[in-house]
């Protein structure tokens, strides 16, 4: 389930993106951009 996937992603320090009925494209794109900055800086 989604909670397990979130825990897995957190444990392995990987990005998890969730697209569901509540997803709005502009905010989703913003989140992807910010995640790219965050995860890119951890390399």
Swiss-Prot record:
Pathway: Carbohydrate degradation; L-arabinose degradation via L-ribulose; D-xylulose 5-phosphate from L-arabinose (bacterial route): step 1/3. The keyword DNA-binding does not apply. It is an enzyme of class 5 (isomerase). GO terms for molecular function: L-arabinose isomerase activity. One of its GO terms (biological process) is L-arabinose catabolic process to xylulose 5-phosphate. Its EC number is 5.3.1.4. It catalyses: beta-L-arabinopyranose = L-ribulose. GO terms for cellular component: cytosol. Keywords: Arabinose catabolism, Carbohydrate metabolism, Isomerase. Belongs to the arabinose isomerase family. Catalyzes the conversion of L-arabinose to L-ribulose. Homohexamer. This is L-arabinose isomerase.
